[in-house]
């Protein structure tokens, strides 16, 4: 009998297991893959402050590179460049980072089983590909796969290739906006170091494989090292994180950012909060304590995620012509102001700045108004 079984050896799942085991309880992590950390779906962007809050100190293996600037391109080829030095953003190797957290969880006493799939819940535990396991609590960290039957409109197809190319700039992330090619999202280039980078595309109902190939051909010569196809979730947190003895964490709970689908920090904190709350419920023999996990996560991220969802609604409703006009309205002062921000994970104010609407309704003439006005009002 385990105190908790966690399905999914993701960062969120491993952090959940770490906190449960840290408190002296037994936790079992089920990972369906052959190893923790693979395949590497994530772009790997995270701030040093976020990693510190997650209790992770980067090793030489898990650190790839440091990001100094972000270059954002409009559909007609204009661009702005933002100094991101103050945000202290790094690119991490998710395969190694997840293994690092797996070692933390194991050192506290958690058990990790690879090549083991979760098949379903049974009265006293869970059914797995390696037999039934009894447990008191079940934690769903299976990622976007858990959301497929909840709301398909919130799931975007994504392709990310790891490539070697001489056009990848060290220390610079590139974002390409194009509502015709990547509706509701964008293409990106994230440098990993030594001429290697992660190149990806995502958007509503796109043919990700074809579009990433077109993007790469347009960029120049390249060699593909690895191909990853994985959906992302962009609709924010699900309605409830807990039901009876089941706890949902990470991407499965919709805890990735609605704007970029990034979730190392927000999903990781979800894992820590869930693990601590489960430990408290076990210690007090009171499963009603589980609701504290959801309350804590929403208190930390709820307001920011609501604003990011509003920003997403606005951005999904504008066309390329409008995006180009917005780029024309961005002033050096706006860029300097955004560059001065030091928080990578709570970034709605920067989005408002980029829309050119802080303190005015000029851009409202280009957009359909209710969400925009609400977004502006949340910025004070």
Regions found by a protein language model. Give the residues of each.
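Hydrophobic anchor at the start of a short beta-strand
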Residues: 4, 17, 25-27, 138, ...
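C-terminal helical "tail/cap" subdomain of flavin- and related membrane-associated enzymes
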Residues: 279-380
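A conserved beta-strand/loop capping segment in the N-terminal third of enzymes
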Residues: 49-100
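Conserved N-terminal glycine-rich FAD pyrophosphate-binding loop of Rossmann-like flavoproteins
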Residues: 33-55
């Amino acid at each position: 009998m385990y105190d908790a079984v966690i399905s999914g050896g993701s960062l969120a799942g491993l952090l959940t297991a770490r906190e449960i085991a840290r408190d002296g309880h037994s936790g079992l992590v089920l990972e369906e893959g052959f190893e923790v950390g693979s395949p590497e779906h994530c772009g790997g962007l995270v701030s040093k402050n976020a990693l510190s809050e997650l209790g992770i100190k980067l090793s030489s293996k898990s650190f790839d590179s440091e990001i100094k600037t972000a270059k954002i391109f409009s559909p007609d080829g204009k661009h702005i460049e933002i100094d991101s030095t103050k945000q202290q953003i790094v690119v991490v190797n998710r395969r190694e980072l997840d293994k690092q957290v797996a070692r933390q969880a194991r050192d506290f006493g958690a058990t990790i089983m690879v090549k083991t799939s979760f098949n379903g819940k049974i009265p006293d535990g869970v059914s797995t590909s390696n037999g039934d396991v009894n447990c008191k609590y079940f934690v769903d960290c299976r990622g976007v796969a858990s959301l497929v039957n909840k709301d398909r409109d919130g799931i975007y197809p994504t392709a990310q290739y790891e490539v070697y190319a001489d056009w990848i700039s060290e220390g610079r992330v590139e974002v390409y906006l194009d509502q015709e090619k990547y509706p509701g999202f964008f293409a990106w280039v994230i440098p990993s170091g030594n001429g290697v980078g992660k190149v990806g595309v995502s958007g509503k109902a796109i043919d990700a494989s074809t579009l990433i190939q077109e993007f790469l051909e347009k960029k120049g010569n390249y060699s593909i090292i690895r191909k990853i196809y994985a959906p992302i979730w962009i609709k924010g947190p699900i309605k409830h994180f807990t039901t009876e003895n089941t706890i949902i964490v990470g991407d499965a709970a919709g805890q990735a950012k609605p704007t970029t689908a990034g979730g190392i920090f927000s999903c990781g904190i979800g894992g820590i909060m869930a693990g601590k709350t489960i430990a408290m419920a076990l210690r007090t023999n009171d499963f009603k304590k589980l609701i504290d996990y959801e309350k804590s996560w929403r208190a930390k991220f709820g307001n920011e995620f609501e604003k990011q969802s509003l920003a997403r609604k606005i951005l999904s409703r504008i066309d390329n012509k409008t995006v180009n006009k917005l780029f024309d309205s961005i002033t050096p002062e706006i860029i300097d102001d955004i560059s001065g921000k030091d928080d990578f994970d709570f970034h709605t104010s920067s989005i408002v700045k980029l829309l050119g609407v802080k303190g005015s309704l000029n851009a409202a003439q280009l957009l359909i108004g209710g969400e925009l006005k609400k977004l502006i009002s949340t910025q004070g």
